[in-house]
Amino acid sequence: TYKPSKARIIQCENKATAKKALKALKDGTDPEEVASQYMVDSATYSGKETLITTKKTDISTRMINKLYKTKKAGVIDEIFTNESSGTTYAYVAVLVTNTYKDIKDEVYTTLSSDDDVKKACLVYYLKKYNFEVHDQDVFDNLKANNPEYLVSRPDLAKSKD
């Protein structure tokens, strides 16, 4: 599942900085103002509203689950860490909403522009309607470029990792 929620996340260099940012957020300071003061220079998350799903691999699963399960919008009283490219960053978050009806349009837009989702949907329908290729040129092209679409030949659809 994608566990969507909308949050303002601030990426900090370490836990000590994140602790200061969390205190400022709890004191009522605007997340973008807190971010400008405490975020790491190369931050992906800078206090702006962001749709968070399980597709986001640069933040911890624990944060995604916490945002998804929290009942009330506001500052999440916890510091999250995640190692990214050999560097450990600390994050603080403010939940904007995790109510599906409030973010469904954004979730729809995000998922419909995701190549993995598009591919999975196409494969689903190709299987459902027993897609077969009888033209050798088309078959060869699909075999070379998109073997997962050859659903009638699952032996070819496997990736060669």
Predicted segments with their positions:
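PPIase-associated folding chaperone regions across multiple families
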Residues: 1-20, 36, 58-161
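Non-transmembrane alpha-helical segments in soluble domains
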Residues: 22-26
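Residue-level recognition of short, well-ordered coil/turn positions
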Residues: 29-30, 72
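Intrinsically disordered or highly flexible coil/loop and linker segments, enriched in small
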Residues: 30-31, 44, 131
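Short, well-ordered alpha-helical segments enriched in acidic and aromatic residues
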Residues: 31-41
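Gly/Pro- and small hydrophobic-enriched strand-loop and loop-to-helix capping segments
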Residues: 40-48
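Extracellular C-terminal loop/segment signatures of secreted glycoproteins
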Residues: 48-57
